[in-house]
Each structure stands twice: as structure tokens, then as C-alpha cells.
Amino acid sequence: MPQHIHMAGIIPVAGLETDFNQQLPDVMMPVDVGFAAIQKSVYECAMVGCQTIWIVANNDLAPIIRNTVGEWIYDPVYYETKTLFPSENRKEIPIYYVPVHPNDRDKRDSYGWSILYGAYSAWLVAAKISKWVLPEKYYVSFPMSAYDLPSLRTHRLEIASRDANFFLSYDGKTVKDELPIAFTFNGEDFKACRN
């Protein structure tokens, strides 16, 4: 049985560029009735077992997203558990909003940088609290991707495993092939990307 690790969910919004040309922010695009793309990513992070969720959105979009998403979500695995007192067994996952640092805007302001900055922010805040809550793994969910979310539950232990990174794939292609599909990375991968 794998050991429990702290996995932080990273949802990059800052630096997102699409060609949809609509009035609403692209992450607010509906993907189902009453379900926006950003809500899909938050639910996905909760479904795979993230203990915290970090949305990297600059100050222009963060209030809109916070109004839609909120500040926490129930873990779907614990929420769906049939027990005598279900409300006592529910687990809340906090959602944090982080803007890209002003010194990095218009210099290192890209979609990839918002992923790295989200991971850095999650680590920095946790380091100030306690070494016991430091993220050991990061799960990246892209709001503009679509796939079967309930199927991720079957891979929950594999995704949270310390042993290897997890990549979703489509036709044999992953994020390494520039597809915006979810993946995980650890602290060593983060250091390699920053250098």
C-alpha cells in the first residue's frame, strides 16, 4: 500500500491564450449545464486526491473565478461514501488563488510559467506552516481540456504514488507533445524545469 503523500493541484489560468474570441473569460466557458471549464479542473484535482488546490490567476480574473468556484470543495470520494452520518466523514479541500508575481509579468508570463509559479507558491506557503504539509507531488489540470473525470478515480492511488509521475494520454500523446492534458511532477522535476 502506498504511503500517504501531500499532493497539490495546480490549475494554470494566467497566460492562457485561446482563439475562441468570446466576451467571457475562456475558463468560464460552459462544458456542461451549470459546469464551467474552471470548475471541471477543480473537480478533477479533487477527484485525483489533491489535498490543496492552487489556481494561478492574475488579479483581473481571480475575483470572477473565486465567485464561481469558491474557497473549498468536498473530496468526491469521501462525499459519495454511504455512512450513518455522511456530513461527519466529508473532507474539505481548500482552494487558494495566486497571481503571477508582478516582476514576472510581461517577462516570464506564460502558461508554462504559471504552472511553475503555482508549484512554487504551494511549496512556499506550506514551508512557512510546517514541514509536514510540504507538497511532495503536484498535479496539473488544464481548464481547456476534456476527458472522462470519473475514470480518474480508478487511478487515484497510481496518480498519488511517490514512485513515478503520471501522464494522461490521447492517441499516445501527452503533455510532452504539447497537448494540454493532466500530468504530475515532483520537486526534483520542478527544480530541473526552473533551471
Please state what every model-predicted region is.
Residues 16-17, 60, 145:
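Short, glycine/serine-rich, charged loops/turns that create anion-binding
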Residues 69-93:
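Short mixed-charge
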Residues 63-69:
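Acidic helix N-cap motif at the loop->helix transition within catalytic regions
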Residues 84-194:
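Conserved beta-loop-beta/alpha segment of the NTase-like Rossmann-fold superfamily
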Residues 11-13, 32, 57, 142, ...:
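Short beta-strand/turn micro-motifs composed of small residues
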Residues 52-58:
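Short internal beta-strands
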Residues 1-30, 35, 39-40, 46-52:
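N-terminal nucleotide-binding beta1-loop-alpha1 segment
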Residues 43, 47, 67, 120:
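Short, well-ordered alpha-helices that flank and scaffold nucleotide-derived cofactor binding pockets
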